[in-house]
């Protein structure tokens, strides 16, 4: 667990990962060096796992987002299919899920034809995938990687 000061630091970093230690310190009434030490400890403990830039998929020519529900023939405990899926460039996320499907996979492609090629040539080439269903995103109403951290 993290204390209330670390929680505030993490909340501020989620809103703006480029915020300076000095700015965080001013807002929390702490020295920038103390903020730096706290952030380093959060990184060492694995609370902060990295710093990422948010990109506009549409402006990068990736107009189609889709979710793939996958059933595999993997043995219980084996994640061979998941690892193969995760190594495909168009795959952003792979989640092991409960229910009739094994994995939920988020994809980004240039267009529907590109999605079709991806499904046939890359995902279809994974022999342990028994069945998949694709849902194409029509409109994104919220896409935010921030976690709900309460003060």
Regions found by a protein language model. Give the residues of each.
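A compositional/biophysical signature of low hydrophobicity enriched in polar/charged and small residues
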Residues: 1-151
């Amino acid at each position: 667990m993290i204390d209330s000061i670390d929680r505030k630091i993490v909340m501020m970093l989620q809103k703006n990962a480029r915020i300076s230690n000095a700015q965080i310190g001013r807002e929390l009434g702490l020295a920038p060096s103390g903020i730096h030490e706290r952030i380093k400890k959060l990184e060492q403990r694995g609370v902060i796992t990295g710093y990422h830039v948010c990109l506009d998929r549409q402006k990068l020519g990736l107009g189609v987002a889709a979710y793939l529900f996958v059933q595999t023939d993997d043995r219980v405990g084996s994640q061979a299919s998941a690892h193969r899926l995760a190594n495909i460039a168009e795959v952003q996320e792979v989640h092991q899920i409960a229910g009739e499907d094994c994995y939920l996979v988020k994809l980004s492609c240039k267009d529907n034809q590109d999605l079709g090629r991806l499904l046939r040539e890359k995902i279809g080439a994974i022999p342990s995938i028994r069945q998949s269903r694709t849902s194409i995103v029509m409109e994104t109403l919220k896409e935010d990687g921030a976690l709900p951290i309460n003060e």
